[in-house]
């Protein structure tokens, strides 16, 4: 009986150790709670990579002109993501001074990095817009 308990405890300890050995850090909207950074900015992506994050999550909206832009909120600095053209959205300055990025610009900045990207498509207002966004991605 003691041997069974010892084997069970050993297996439990091994599985707990094994699980913790695979835990990875994902930066939510990049590493943005640091100087010179902002949520979903290219700087936040670069900083997530620089500290060795396994991945960096970011949010994508389909703008009114069917271009994809990177931002978390449905409305940002007075502009609704779905109702505004991408040119108006990319003219918005983030809190760190960067322009709100397009998905293409964001992906280009990510190409040389080791951090994996986790794209969250923000819920479009209609199934048709959702399909368009998915096809563009």
Regions found by a protein language model. Name each.
Residues 5-15:
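Sec-dependent N-terminal signal peptides
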Residues 1-2:
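N-terminal secretory signal peptides that target proteins for export/translocation
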Residues 17-137:
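Phosphate-group recognition and catalysis centered on beta-loop-alpha active-site segments
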